[in-house]
């Protein structure tokens, strides 16, 4: 028979191809990381970084070379290792056999003796000898063979044991609460505590009603169920079973409950075993991924574990690191039994056992927090859980110390700081404890200023919040300068210091070296428009209302455009101040339908001024805007006018006659003021009661006089008026040139024209009768009756005077001549004859008064001049 082959040992060995592949991946990863970092470094830093990497990689490469050369000798070495392992295994089997024999000897001391051999005793006592003992010890008859148990007997025995154990547990044993769930099978009872252990017990007692608690229990199997724990080695299992049986034997003698004792021993052993596993995992982490950032201290008396992490956060005193103020304390402690548990306690679920727990305390900033420990949580998960909580505390502290106007929020385990369109994301590395800064615009390769801020924070020279405040303001300044340059703006220095940034254009400089600038307050995130003199003093300032839009080149162009608008509005304000007119600057709602809705970033504004107006139909409130280098004035007319078309545009003025809205586009305030005066006169004309208003436009108003005389009042650019009578035979054509200056700006602007037309109509009616009428002015007229005879009509405030005149020597063609020719007219007696013969005072009801000696007829205001002249002229024709 050939001896068995020596087993080949593979545990703890790694194939060389896997080592080479792992090393290759590691080198490639470091090269990729190096390629990302090198472009942002200086030449000296690049050389230093490459040299460090070469020295470190050379050491690993030399080790790999040694392993490759050793491969040639590895078969012989492996064979020696297998032989040594085989011999050590045989030695362990021999030693284990000795220990097992000792244990059997110890355990058999508690076994019951077999029944007396009555057959042999009777044989010896009756015959004096025994046939079975007569043979030599080497004889086969020396060993008495026992009849083997049948399967039925075995099953009956196991069933009897199961019933015995079930009765004992149901009626007589005190079962701790963790042992509530158990299984009885194959003559044993198995108690399982999840994530801790399972233990199997049996008995050699035959009576479940043993007095007291003298029921004999024997541990026959044990297994650990701890997470991250391999199967229980045989030597540990045997040791634990032996220890448990010894404790059971001692408790059997002292009459103590067995099951609570077993649970206390095994539960406490599992807790200490888990604490030991956490210590081993911590030691492994401190040598690998957490190297330099973790230190574990394990104390055996009493067993406890302290984890010190992030040593760079130690408080420094006089340049020396102080005591660590944050660490994790893991230990086993007993918890008191609550009153609720005592109330629910029973024999089947007893609380009379040691309530040992594995507790985790987190010490930080003088505060102790209890952290729940999951059954499946290892050392790395526990560290990550604690460091993430610590990171949140650090980020929250930084958030509180940030500038009040810096908007930040917790997102995804980090702190997000908003800088216009971009975002600075601040996170804490869970392993190193250092702050990591990244940008949303370039998350893989953060800008140089972010890396510089990381370095300053790592040096721990200043509080992180102070560095982040400066970084925030630096990012704002950098982004503003970049966008301003694209928007053709340049930064202005020397006028304002931090926190203001000012921008301007060359064309914004006014006379006297005053300058318009856009000022941005980086602390309050607010814009303003300012006018500065040469000494840097602020002459005028106006806040700019911005919305939540993004800052871009388009938005900056909008700001530039807004400043140009503000310059125009400032000129209007200056004009209003000079004229003593009240004004107020108002922001326009962002959803208002206006023409200069350029972007959604800047909320434009308008100027509200109060224009002087004596016309109640014209609203004095005027809103002023600016667009494309022009001033836009908006106002309204109250009431409904007899318009010719619904809307009308005349040069720089637009009006909607339906709503009365007026829009005037001009270059300066003086032009608007001139147009405004013209509109006041136009509205005053349209609201008159002296005439019937037929139609109104921006240039003229059409009237009707006495239902048959239609004429038009036209307004010129210099706010003067001309009258035009549509009827070419109208008698008023004679005096139209004298009617131009009869208008005023009041509500009764056209009333004098009605009075004049009413009083002159009686004189001018002579034209309709075929006589020549001469107008020297609106008060003096001559009616030519013949070549050498006429009537002079003088209008005054009291009435009218008719004087009879005759022409001496001048030719009729000179009747329209100068005053010299007119003076040649002399009074005559014809009018006296008319008065004495055909006109009587009674007939005209006292409306006229004759003065024969002066050849005059006087009439008061109420006299009907038209009727009187018709009467006189009719009489003259008869003669």
Swiss-Prot record:
Gene Ontology molecular function terms on file: transcription coactivator activity; transcription coregulator activity
GO cellular component: core mediator complex; mediator complex; nucleus
Segments forming a coiled coil: none
Main location, first listed in the record: nucleus
Function, as annotated: Component of the Mediator complex, a coactivator involved in the regulated transcription of nearly all RNA polymerase II-dependent genes. Mediator functions as a bridge to convey information from gene-specific regulatory proteins to the basal RNA polymerase II transcription machinery. Mediator is recruited to promoters by direct interactions with regulatory proteins and serves as a scaffold for the assembly of a functional preinitiation complex with RNA polymerase II and the general transcription factors.
Record-given protein name: Mediator of RNA polymerase II transcription subunit 14
Pfam families according to UniProt: Med14 (PF08638)
Family named by the database record: Belongs to the Mediator complex subunit 14 family.
Species lineage: Eukaryota, Fungi, Dikarya, Ascomycota, Taphrinomycotina
The keyword Cell membrane appears for this protein: no
Any one biological process term the GO annotation gives: transcription initiation at RNA polymerase II promoter
Annotated keywords: Activator, Nucleus, Transcription, Transcription regulation
Compartments, as annotated in UniProt: Nucleus
Subunit details: Component of the Mediator complex.
């Amino acid at each position: 028979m050939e001896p068995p082959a020596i087993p080949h040992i593979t545990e703890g060995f790694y194939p060389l191809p896997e080592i080479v592949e792992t090393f290759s991946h590691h080198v490639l990863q470091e090269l990729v990381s190096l390629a990302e970092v090198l472009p942002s470094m200086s030449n000296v830093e690049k050389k230093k970084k490459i040299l460090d990497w070469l020295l470190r990689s050379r050491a690993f490469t030399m080790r790999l070379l040694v392993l490759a050369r050793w491969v040639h000798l590895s078969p012989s070495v492996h064979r020696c290792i297998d032989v040594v392992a085989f011999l050590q295994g045989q030695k362990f089997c021999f030693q284990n056999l000795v220990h097992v024999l000792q244990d059997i000897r110890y355990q058999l001391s508690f076994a019951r003796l077999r029944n007396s051999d009555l057959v042999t005793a009777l044989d010896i006592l009756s015959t004096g000898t025994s046939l079975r003992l007569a043979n030599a010890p080497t004889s086969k008859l020396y060993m008495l063979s026992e009849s083997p148990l049948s399967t039925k007997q075995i099953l009956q025995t196991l069933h009897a044991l199961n019933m015995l154990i079930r009765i004992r547990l149901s009626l007589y044993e005190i079962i701790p609460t963790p042992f509530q769930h158990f299984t009885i099978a194959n003559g044993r009872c198995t108690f399982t505590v999840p994530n801790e252990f399972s233990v199997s017990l049996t008995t050699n007692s035959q009576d479940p009603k043993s007095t007291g608690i003298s029921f004999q229990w024997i541990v026959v199997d044990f297994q650990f169920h701890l997470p991250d724990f391999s199967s229980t080695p045989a030597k540990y299992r045997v040791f634990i079973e032996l220890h448990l049986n010894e404790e059971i034997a001692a408790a059997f003698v002292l009459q103590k409950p067995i099951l609570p004792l077993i649970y206390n021993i095994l539960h406490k052993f599992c807790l200490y075993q888990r604490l030991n596993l956490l210590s081993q995992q911590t030691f492994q982490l401190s040598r690998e991924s957490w190297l330099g950032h973790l230190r574990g201290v394990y104390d055996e008396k009493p067993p406890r574990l302290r984890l010190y992490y992030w040593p760079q956060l130690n408080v420094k005193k006089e340049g020396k690191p102080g005591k660590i103020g944050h660490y994790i304390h893991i230990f086993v402690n007993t918890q008191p039994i609550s009153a609720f548990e005592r109330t629910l306690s029973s024999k089947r679920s007893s609380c009379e056992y040691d309530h040992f727990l594995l507790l985790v305390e987190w010490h930080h900033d003088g505060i102790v927090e209890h952290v729940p420990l999951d059954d499946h949580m290892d050392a790395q998960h526990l560290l990550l859980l604690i460091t993430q909580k610590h990171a949140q505390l650090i980020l929250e502290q930084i958030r509180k110390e940030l500038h009040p106007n810096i908007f930040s929020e917790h997102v995804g385990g980090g702190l997000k700081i908003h800088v216009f369109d971009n975002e600075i994301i601040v996170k804490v590395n869970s392993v190193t404890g250092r702050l990591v800064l990244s940008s949303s615009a370039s998350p893989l390769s953060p800008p140089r200023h972010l890396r510089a801020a990381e370095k300053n924070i790592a040096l721990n020279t200043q509080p992180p919040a102070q560095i982040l405040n400066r970084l925030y303001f630096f990012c704002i300044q950098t982004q503003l300068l970049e966008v301003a340059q694209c928007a053709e703006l340049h930064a202005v220095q020397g006028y304002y210091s931090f926190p203001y940034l000012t921008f301007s254009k060359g064309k914004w400089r006014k006379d006297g070296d005053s300058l318009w600038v856009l000022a941005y307050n980086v602390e309050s995130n607010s814009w303003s428009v300012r006018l500065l003199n040469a000494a840097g003093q602020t002459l005028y300032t106006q806040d700019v209302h911005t919305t939540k839009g993004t800052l871009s080149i388009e938005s900056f162009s909008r700001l530039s455009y807004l400043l140009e608008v503000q310059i125009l509005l400032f000129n209007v304000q200056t004009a209003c101040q000079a004229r003593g007119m009240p004004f107020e600057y108002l922001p326009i709602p962002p959803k208002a339908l206006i023409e200069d809705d350029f972007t959604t970033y800047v909320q434009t504004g308008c100027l509200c001024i109060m224009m002087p107006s004596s016309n109640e139909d014209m609203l004095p409130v005027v809103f002023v805007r600016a667009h494309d280098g022009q001033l836009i004035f908006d106002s309204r007319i109250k009431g409904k006018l007899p318009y010719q078309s619904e809307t009308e545009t005349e040069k720089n003025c637009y009006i909607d006659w339906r709503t009365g809205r007026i829009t005037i586009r001009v270059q300066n305030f003086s032009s608007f003021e001139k147009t405004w005066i013209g509109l006041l006169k136009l509205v005053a004309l349209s609201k008159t009661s002296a005439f019937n208003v037929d139609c109104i436009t921006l240039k003229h108003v059409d009237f009707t006089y006495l239902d048959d005389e239609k004429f038009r009042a036209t307004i010129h650019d210099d706010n003067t008026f001309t009258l035009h009578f549509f009827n070419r035979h109208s008698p008023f054509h004679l005096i139209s040139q004298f009617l131009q200056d009869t208008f005023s700006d009041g509500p009764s602007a056209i009333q004098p024209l009605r009075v004049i037309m009413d009083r002159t109509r009686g004189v001018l009616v002579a034209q309709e009768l075929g006589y020549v009428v001469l107008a020297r002015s609106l008060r003096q007229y001559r009616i030519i009756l013949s070549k050498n005879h006429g009537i002079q009509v003088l209008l005054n405030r009291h009435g009218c005077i008719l004087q009879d005149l005759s022409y001496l020597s001048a030719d009729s063609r000179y009747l329209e001549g100068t005053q010299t020719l007119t003076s040649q007219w002399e009074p005559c007696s014809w009018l006296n004859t008319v008065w004495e013969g055909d006109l009587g005072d009674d007939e005209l009801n006292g409306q006229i008064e004759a003065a024969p000696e002066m050849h005059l007829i006087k009439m008061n205001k109420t006299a009907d001049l038209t009727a009187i002249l018709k009467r006189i002229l009719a009489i003259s024709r008869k003669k």
